[in-house]
Each structure stands twice: as C-alpha cells, then as structure tokens.
C-alpha cells in the first residue's frame, strides 16, 4: 500500500508510524516540521540543501495538525496537507511525510522530538529551521529544551539571514557546523 493511500484511521496511523520508526540501523535524519499549508517548492529546496550540507540519510517532513503559534482559521485540513506534501515528494525515497503529532497527541515540538528520540534511539536527528522561524523561536514552548536536545540547522530564506541569526545568537551558542554534525552522526 502506498504512503498516500493509507486510510485515515488511528490504527492506520499507528501502523504507519511503526513502519517509520522501525530501526534500520543508525541514520542521520533531518526533521522539517511545519504546517505545510500548502507544501511548496521552497520546502523541497531547503530539504535538498539540508540533505547535501548535513549529509542526511533522510528528511522527515512532519506536518503539524495545528501550530500553536498560528490561527487555525485559514488552515487546510490535516489530511489534505499530508496528501499535498506526499504528492510533492512522490518519487523521492529519502523524504518521509507524516504527522507524528497527530499520533503522539501533542502539537509541541519538544514533546515530539522527545518521543522520536525514545522510539529511534540509534538515529541522529537534526532539527531543520528556516531563518525566518529563528526570530520567533524564543516563543516556542520549551525552546531551550529543543536546542539542548537536537542540533538545529538554520536555513537561510530570502529576506531572512543575518537579522535572524543575530536574533537567535544566544539560542545557537555552541551549536555545531554541518561538517561537525556529519562527524557526530557517524561516530
């Protein structure tokens, strides 16, 4: 059964998550979380850049049921956003699209990252974040725990670079370079 034709039931989600979390050995995985409302070429572009720069084995697009910092008024239904993201990534085997927060019953990144690390202890995760999101990172619940738990790769976006990096300098203090992340993930 293809990823995009799974029935929308809790049982199917658990089965899908179980397959996704099956430990295939140590992998370097980039986590790109967001609303994906809608998924677009920019998501693909930063995914490809991050994979090359960080030497990632996979990138997981984690479609959030509801970003706690955004209004739900203009949000497309989760199933539609998942379908669009899967269509956009069809044929790219190293990108996985799923909604872990729906299965974990949370919409908070720190809790999602904690569960992923528990379920996949051999994998090495890196949070992928657009520079525009770095400006508001301090408003994320338990942002300090996220920054201590996983490396964060900040990806430049048009109009967001130096200003965002400056705003997040304290949060990124002591963070590793892409080359250092590769070495850490291999070790």
Predicted regions and their residues:
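Nucleotidyltransferase catalytic core that binds NTPs
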Residues: 2-187
